[in-house]
Amino acid sequence: MVIFSSYFSKQMNRFSTPFVFFFKKLNNTLKKSLQFIMRFHSYHPMFICLLRDSSRNENRKKKVSIGLRTIMRAFSFLMQVATCLIRYSLILTCLVAILLSVLWRIQFAALRMHDLIEEELKMFVLQHNCTLADLWSGKCPSSEDE
């Protein structure tokens, strides 16, 4: 879990987004919760399982929780899934930001083009002394006729 936590920290340091602070806080919270679980396990008699302690007498057995190991495996798996989701959500956020930037530039260019066309139409109508309805119906003389 410590390896995963340091890997998670290194990955988060690679991104310079506003979300980094939040994810660092999340990482610290997860570390503290893991430490709490380990302390709870060492003092709580509810988790009982027998594992051999190879450093001591072979007949002595150490109480360790199968339930805790299962919880820790599930927790580790969920953390890996969360890391993938965070990584891909950051990548997706960057892609969406790029897409929105491109769309905003296209929209800005289209609005400028619309304004230019509108100005040209107004000037054409004023020069030829006709209305927009005349222009659309074809009654207004074109600049090629002159």
Swiss-Prot record:
UniProt name for this protein: Meiotically up-regulated gene 96 protein
Gene Ontology biological-process entries: meiotic cell cycle
GO CC, any one term: membrane
Keywords: Cytoplasm, Meiosis, Membrane, Transmembrane, Transmembrane helix
Biological function: Has a role in meiosis.
Transmembrane segments: 85-104
Gene designation per UniProt: mug96
Subcellular localization(s) per the UniProt record: Cytoplasm; Membrane
